[in-house]
Swiss-Prot record:
Family statement drawn from the similarity comment of this UniProt entry: Belongs to the TFIIB family.
Gene Ontology cellular component annotations, sorted alphabetically: transcription preinitiation complex
Name by which UniProt lists this protein: Transcription initiation factor IIB 2
Function: Stabilizes TBP binding to an archaeal box-A promoter. Also responsible for recruiting RNA polymerase II to the pre-initiation complex (DNA-TBP-TFIIB).
Swiss-Prot/TrEMBL keywords: Metal-binding, Repeat, Transcription, Transcription regulation, Zinc, Zinc-finger
Species of the source: Thermoplasma volcanium (strain ATCC 51530 / DSM 4299 / JCM 9571 / NBRC 15438 / GSS1)
Gene: tfbB
SMART domains: CYCLIN (SM00385)
Length: 313
């Protein structure tokens, strides 16, 4: 990329992370992303893509497949194929637009937005995908998971599965389904907190999508949550290994059958934290796992009795 073009892009980019307000931002031109080095949030993902998303094995194939512009994305209602007009009052080279021309540019932007979103269906899709992006940013999920979420949501729209349900609940259910599809654990509680949508509504919408779209998602296990919960509790690898060993033994004895995976994982971590000399209270673990202290206490009693584990509480 020419130096002047790169400077123009950098001048339009945010200077501060909207999540943690850090100014330590990293520009990844290869992937077209602006990333916060402190919290890991992807602040922008629409920089010019300089590399192809295809492979070519000879020069003829390379010429046939050559293209200009960003690759298609499900995260935009028009799949990223339309032209974008920036809202900053600067031109391509980063120079400020004269005051006498700003009113004209504003009218062009306004009509451009109207043309891009021309009917109610496109307007609703645009709002839903913006919401999906916002929730995804709060959860810290990568772009490929957001793409999968957007694809699931689009399929739900095509099959008219949103009728009678809120857009917010279907968006949240799509994110939850996408996370389960690639085995990236995100609990309903986490998604509910990030979206401010009722947990029960998300669960109901998810079951509706899973059935109607035939998602065939594997059930989650306690192993899916152990590393995530331990990291949030600042527990090391040793605690993770012990927690997984406890869960493995509990599952082999049938203790986990019919029980929620997050509750089993939370109880195992509670035991492991004491064993490694870094005890965490049931209240602390309940807060990060999204299960109640009563659930952790009940699972802990069942596991410790079956495995003959004794710890000083």
């Amino acid at each position: 990329m020419p130096y002047s073009d790169k400077m123009a892009i950098e001048s339009e980019a945010p200077k501060r992370c909207p999540e943690c307000h850090s100014e330590h931002l990293i520009r990844d031109y290869e992937h077209g992303e602006l990333i916060c080095a402190d919290c890991g949030a992807v602040i922008e993902d629409s920089f010019i893509d300089q590399g192809p998303e295809w492979r070519a094995f000879d020069s003829d194939q390379d010429e046939r497949r050559a293209r200009t512009g960003s690759p298609m994305t499900y995260l935009s209602h028009d799949k990223g194929l339309a032209t974008e007009i920036s809202w900053s009052n600067k031109d391509y080279y980063g120079k400020r637009i004269p005051h006498k021309n700003r009113a004209q540019i504003y009218r062009v932007r306004k009509w451009h937005q109207r043309i891009r979103v021309s009917n109610a269906a496109e307007r609703n899709l645009s709002l839903a995908l913006q919401l999906l992006n916002d929730i995804g940013a709060k959860l810290g999920i990568p772009k490929d998971i957001k793409e999968t979420s957007a694809l699931i949501y689009r399929k739900a729209v095509e099959k008219n599965l949103i009728r009678g349900r809120s857009i917010e609940s279907i968006v949240c259910a799509s994110i939850y389904a996408a996370c389960r599809k690639v085995n990236i654990p995100r609990t309903l509680d986490e998604i509910a907190k990030a979206s401010e949508v009722n947990k029960k509504k998300i669960g109901k919408a998810y079951r509706h999508l899973a059935k109607e779209l035939d998602l065939n998602l594997r059930p989650t296990t306690p192993f899916s949550y152990i590393a995530q919960f331990c990291n949030k509790l600042d527990l090391d690898k040793q605690a993770i290994v012990i927690s997984e060993d406890i869960v493995r033994q509990a599952m082999s004895m049938g203790i986990s059958s019919g029980k929620g995976p997050t509750g089993i994982a939370a109880a195992a971590i509670y035991i492991a934290s004491v064993k490694v000399g870094k005890p965490r209270t049931q209240k602390e673990i309940a807060r990060i796992s999204g299960v109640t202290e009563v659930t952790i206490r009940n699972r802990y009693k069942e596991i410790s009795k079956a495995l003959n584990i004794s710890i000083s509480e």
